[in-house]
Structures are given as C-alpha cells and as structure tokens.
Regions:
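Short, low-complexity disordered leader/linker segments with a strong preference
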Residues: 1-39
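N-terminal secretory/targeting leader peptides
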Residues: 24-127, 136, 144-336
Length: 336
C-alpha cells in the first residue's frame, strides 16, 4: 500500500510539473507572438500613379503604425514582382506575401470569381459595391481559403471600356472585325466574339507597342489603366461601354496569415475594408479627371446605349452560368 501511495505521489508530481510546463509554454509562445516582427512584400501590376498603389502604400503605413512596427509592408507596383498569376502562385506556396489582383486572374484559382468576367453583370458602381461588401462578396472571399489564400477585401479597378484607333463605337456593328486585345480569359474571349470582334490575348506589357505599330486595333481596360498607362496617346476613340466591372482582390498568403496573432489579423481586416472604400472613392473622382484629360488630348469619347450589346452576349451567360452558379448570378442581377 505504501508503495502504491508512493507511485501515486510521483505520478501526481509529474502531472503537476507537466501542467506548469504547459502554462509556461503558452506564456512563452504568447510573448514570442507579441515580439515577432514581419517584413512583407505586396505586389500588383498597375502603374505607380494608379489610386490603388497610392492607397496600398497608405494601408501599409497605417498597419505599421497600428501594429507598433511589428508588421512592415513594402509595396511593389508595375509587375515588379511578376505577373498576377505568378504572384498568386507564390502566395499559395508561401513565397509571396500580399497580392492585389484582378478577378480575371483569381478566377483561375477559384472558379466562383469568374462571375465578374460575365459582361454587363452590373448596372452601375453602386450595385457592384453593394454586392461586394455584402454576403455575396464575403462568400467569394472565403472561397479563396481552399487555395491557400486569404481574401481580405475587394478594391476597385473600375469599369472596363473599349478603345480603338479605327472608328467611334456607337452600336455593336461598329465593333465588327476589330482586333481587340483581351486578357487570356475564355469568358472575355467569347464575349468579344459574340460582339463581332476579333479578340487577341496579349500580355499587358506588350499592349502599348502593339497599338502603336497597328498589330491590334484596340484594347479594353478601366479608365485608370487607359489614362495612367497613356494608352490614349495611341488610341483615337474611347467608348464608355462599361462592359465589365473590374474588382481587385486584396489577398494574403494563408501561410503568412496563419502565423499572425489575433490582434494583427483584426488590424489587417479593418484596414483592408477601410482602405478599399477610400481607394474606390479616389478612383471614382479620378475617372472624371481621366475623361476630361483625354478630351483635352483630342480623344473622341462616346457613350453607346448598351442594351443591344447586352442582348448579343446572352449566349455567354448560357455557356458559363452552370459552372459559375446560376443562383449567385441571379442574386447579383436582382440586387438593387
């Protein structure tokens, strides 16, 4: 009996030590977490003068201040760290930290993101923002986690518009036969084919020279890209077709995210949303200036009635709605 009591005492002693050790480990980990510092890189492909770059730099400064220097973010515009697909692949692997990428490319990682490639999905900016900042937008951001990516918020690249060097665009027939540079995106390609154009996939870095040399007749991009990349210098005509609303997704590598303590995660979430709202407003105000500047340059700007365009691209919806999700498409179209 004495022997049994002795053994029990030893066991209890070891258990007590184990619990104390466990508590010590937790406090040590907590201290390490609070003391740890991160130096992160954030990349995107837009020009350094684009509002998204300006606001991303602001966000980096605010996060550094709020984390008391524990997180420092360096921002790299103009594809310095690679193209969007390359950067997202890096974020998935944990070799890249933060990426601000178009949904046209993020759709290759999560098919649900391809919904934004559908032409004429949104009537205006207000409808788009209501969707992106609501349950549908959050559902789409959450879907990135299965790819080793964390979607933080939707920023904005604006509505995509059509430019060309041949003629003003007033109706679908004016597009017929034009060689239009597009991204290598099947929905975009099918949409332009449905409108009678000859879509030509091409890396954006090659577009200015191709337009200058007449290899292609036109291209389509938001006004911010058309202006900050000075495409209007080699394009006589701009049609405000607003055929695609182009959100940007602020994404962080899940490997980086999982290493953050809760307080830093909360700061990132708060800043991701607040800075997105500022960037959108900056872009809205900038769009008016971009149009005025292009008119001064001599660019011919038209605002075609998009009703007949919408009719012509209905087969594109029929082709892709099943893969993307008929329910979510209907929810967006029904949003007022």
């Amino acid at each position: 009996l004495k022997k049994s009591k002795f053994i029990s005492s030893i066991v209890i002693g070891f258990l007590t030590l184990g619990l104390l050790a466990g508590c010590g480990a937790q406090s040590t980990n907590k201290a390490t977490s609070n003391d740890q510092k991160w130096e992160l890189k954030a990349g995107h492909v837009a020009a350094s003068s684009h509002p998204m770059n300006t606001e991303l730099i602001t966000m980096a400064k605010q996060i550094e201040e709020k984390t008391k220097g524990r997180v420092k973010i360096s921002v790299f515009p103009e594809a310095t760290l690679g193209g969007e697909r390359e950067m997202l692949e890096g974020a998935k692997l944990g070799t890249m930290d933060i990426v601000l990428a178009t949904t046209a490319v993020t759709g290759n990682f999560d098919p649900k993101m391809k919904i934004f490639d559908l032409p004429f999905l949104f009537k205006d900016r207000e409808q788009a923002i209501k969707v992106l900042d609501g349950p549908i937008g959050q559902q789409l951001l959450d879907g990135m986690s299965s790819q080793g990516l964390v979607g933080l918020s939707f920023w904005e690249n604006g509505f995509r518009n059509l430019t060309n060097s041949k003629r003003p665009i007033e109706k679908p027939a004016d597009i017929k036969g034009l060689k239009i540079r597009t991204m290598e995106n099947p929905i975009h390609l099918d949409a332009w084919k449905a409108l009678g154009a000859s879509p030509t996939p091409m890396a954006f870095a090659e577009v200015f020279t191709a337009l200058q040399q007449g290899t292609i007749d036109g291209q389509e991009n938001p006004l911010a890209i058309i202006s900050t990349s000075r495409l209007y210098e080699v394009q006589k005509y701009v049609a405000l077709t607003k055929h695609n609303y182009s959100p940007m997704v602020l994404i962080i590598s899940k490997k980086v995210w999982d290493a953050f303590p809760d307080d830093i995660k909360a700061i990132f979430k708060e800043q991701a949303m607040s800075n997105a709202k500022v960037e959108r407003q900056m872009l809205k105000e900038a769009d008016e200036k971009y149009i005025a500047d292009m008119k001064k340059f001599g660019t011919v700007i038209t605002t075609p009635d998009t009703t007949p365009f919408r009719e012509m691209v209905k087969p594109v919806y029929d082709k892709y709605s099943k893969d993307i999700g008929e329910d979510i498409i209907k929810q967006i179209l029904d949003t007022k």
